[in-house]
C-alpha cells in the first residue's frame, strides 16, 4: 500500500498541474482574443477614415504579434514542464512495482483446458457488460461454442439496466411483475422499490399528476405488509404537492442516489434469480489477483533467496495464507477438531446423529466395525447415519 501511496502522490501532482495549466491556457487565450479583437476594430475604423494605417497603429500591430508569440512560447514551455511531471509518474511506477510477475505464474494455467476456461470466463464477462459483438468475436477466435440460451439472459438484463441508467422504469417493472413469485420467494424488494421510484417520478410533476399518483398507489397493495412505513411516507408526501416536494419534509424522496441503488438491486436480484453471481467471475479473479500478487512476489523472492524452491510445489496450495478480505468469502470454512485440518470438497464436514461435526476423513478413521463413538459425547451410532452439511 505504501507503493500505491507514493505513485498516487506523484499522480496528484500531475493532475494539479494539468488543472492549473488548463486554467492558464483558457485565461491567456481569452485575453489575446479580446486584445486582438480591440485592435481589429481600431484598424477597421482607421481604414474607413483615410485608408492607411498610422505609424502608431503599425507599432501596436507589431506589439500584438510579439505578444501572441510570447504567449505561445510561454504555454509551450509550461507544457514541457508537465511532460517531465508525467515521466516522474512512470519512474515512480517502475521503482515501486515489479514489472515482471511471471515468476509467480503456474505453467498449468497455459494448458489447453485452462485457456478454454479462461476464454469462457471472458466471454461471460463481455456478455454481462453488454459487449455482445466482442464476445461473439472472441468465441470465433477461441473456437468456442456458446449456446444462444446462455446469451439471451444477459441481453435482456443489459437492455433493462441501460433503461434504468436513463431513468426509464417500464422495462424493469415489466420484468419484475413477470417474475414476481420467484422474487418474493427470495424476499426481494425489487418490485416495490421500482413502483416507489415510479410513484416519486409522478410526484415530481406536481399537482398535474396528483390523480394519476393516487391511482398508481394501488400497486403498493401487495407490499403493504412488509413496507407499510414506506408506503405511509409516500402517501403523506401527497399533501405537499402544491408547494413542491423539494420544499417539503419529504425532500429526501428526491435523492438521486436511489437510481444508482436500484441498478445495484436489480443486478443482484436478477443474477440471483438466474443462478449467476452478482459480480463477473473475471472481475472477482482479477481483484483477488491484485490483492494477492504483492504477497506472492515477496514470498517467491524469499524462497529463491533461501534456495528452498521445494516449498512451492503444491498444485492447489500456496506456501502462505493470503487474506483477500471478507468480500471474497464465498463459503464458510470449517476446521475438523479431530484432524485439525480445514475441510474440502473431497473431505467435507459431516454431522453426526448427536449433532457434533467432524470431517469425513476423521469419520472414516474413527469407524470401528459397525459402530462409531462420538469423540465428544458417549453416543454410539452407525457411520451411515452421518450426513454431509453445507454452511
Curated annotation (Swiss-Prot):
Q: Which GO terms describe its biological process?
A: proteasome-mediated ubiquitin-dependent protein catabolic process; protein polyubiquitination
Q: Name one GO molecular function term.
A: zinc ion binding
Reactions catalysed, semicolon-separated, are:
S-ubiquitinyl-[E2 ubiquitin-conjugating enzyme]-L-cysteine + [acceptor protein]-L-lysine = [E2 ubiquitin-conjugating enzyme]-L-cysteine + N(6)-ubiquitinyl-[acceptor protein]-L-lysine
- Single GO cellular component annotation? GID complex
Q: From which organism does this entry originate?
A: Xenopus laevis (African clawed frog)
| Task of the protein | E3 ubiquitin-protein ligase component of the CTLH complex.
PANTHER family, per the entry: E3 UBIQUITIN-PROTEIN TRANSFERASE RMND5A, MACROPHAGE ERYTHROBLAST ATTACHER-RELATED
| Protein name in UniProt | E3 ubiquitin-protein ligase RMND5A
UniProt keywords (A-Z) are:
Cytoplasm, Metal-binding, Nucleus, Transferase, Ubl conjugation pathway, Zinc, Zinc-finger
Q: Which gene encodes it?
A: rmnd5a
Has the keyword ATP-binding been applied to this entry?
no
Positions of the LisH domain: 114-146
Q: How does it assemble?
A: Identified in the CTLH complex that contains at least RANBP9, MKLN1, MAEA, RMND5A, GID8 and ARMC8.
Subcellular location as annotated = Nucleus, Nucleoplasm; Cytoplasm
What sort of enzyme, by top EC class, is this? transferase
Amino acid at each position: 500500500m505504501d507503493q500505491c501511496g507514493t505513485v498516487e502522490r506523484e499522480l496528484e501532482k500531475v493532475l494539479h498541474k494539468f488543472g492549473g495549466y488548463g486554467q492558464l491556457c483558457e485565461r491567456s487565450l481569452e485575453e489575446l482574443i479580446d486584445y486582438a479583437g480591440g485592435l481589429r476594430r481600431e484598424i477597421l475604423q482607421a481604414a474607413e477614415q483615410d485608408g492607411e494605417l498610422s505609424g502608431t497603429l503599425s507599432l501596436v500591430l507589431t506589439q500584438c504579434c510579439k505578444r501572441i508569440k510570447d504567449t505561445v512560447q510561454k504555454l509551450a514551455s509550461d507544457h514541457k514542464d508537465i511532460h517531465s511531471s508525467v515521466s516522474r509518474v512512470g519512474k515512480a511506477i517502475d521503482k515501486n512495482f515489479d514489472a515482471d510477475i511471471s515468476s509467480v505464474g503456474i505453467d498449468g494455467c497455459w494448458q489447453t483446458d485452462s485457456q478454454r476456461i479462461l476464454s469462457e470466463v471472458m466471454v461471460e464477462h463481455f456478455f454481462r457488460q453488454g459487449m455482445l459483438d466482442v464476445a461473439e468475436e472472441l468465441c470465433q477466435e477461441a473456437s468456442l461454442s456458446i449456446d444462444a440460451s446462455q446469451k439471451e439472459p444477459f441481453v435482456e438484463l443489459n437492455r433493462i439496466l441501460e433503461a434504468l441508467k436513463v431513468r426509464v422504469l417500464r422495462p424493469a417493472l415489466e420484468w419484475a411483475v413477470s417474475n414476481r413469485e420467484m422474487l418474493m420467494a427470495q424476499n426481494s424488494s425489487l418490485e416495490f422499490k421500482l413502483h416507489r421510484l415510479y410513484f416519486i417520478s409522478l410526484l415530481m410533476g406536481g399537482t398535474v399528476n396528483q390523480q394519476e399518483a393516487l391511482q398508481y398507489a394501488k400497486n403498493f397493495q401487495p407490499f403493504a405488509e412488509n413496507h407499510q412505513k414506506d408506503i405511509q411516507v409516500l402517501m403523506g408526501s401527497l399533501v405537499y404537492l402544491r408547494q413542491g416536494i423539494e420544499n417539503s419534509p419529504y425532500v429526501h424522496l428526491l435523492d438521486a442516489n436511489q437510481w444508482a441503488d436500484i441498478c445495484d438491486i436489480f443486478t443482484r436480484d436478477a443474477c440471483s434469480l438466474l443462478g449467476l453471481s452478482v459480480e463477473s467471475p473475471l472481475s472477482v479473479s482479477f481483484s483477488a489477483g491484485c490483492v494477492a500478487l504483492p504477497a506472492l512476489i515477496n514470498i517467491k523472492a524469499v524462497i529463491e533467496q533461501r534456495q528452498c524452491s521445494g516449498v512451492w510445489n503444491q498444485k492447489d496450495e500456496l506456501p502462505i495464507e493470503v487474506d483477500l478480505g471478507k468480500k471474497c468469502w464465498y463459503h464458510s470454512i470449517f476446521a475438523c477438531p479431530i484432524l485439525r485440518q480445514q475441510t474440502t470438497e473431497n473431505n467435507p464436514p459431516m454431522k453426526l446423529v448427536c449433532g457434533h461435526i467432524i470431517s469425513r476423513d476423521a469419520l472414516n478413521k474413527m469407524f470401528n466395525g459397525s459402530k462409531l463413538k462420538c469423540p465428544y459425547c458417549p453416543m454410539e451410532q452407525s457411520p451411515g447415519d452421518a450426513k454431509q452439511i453445507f454452511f
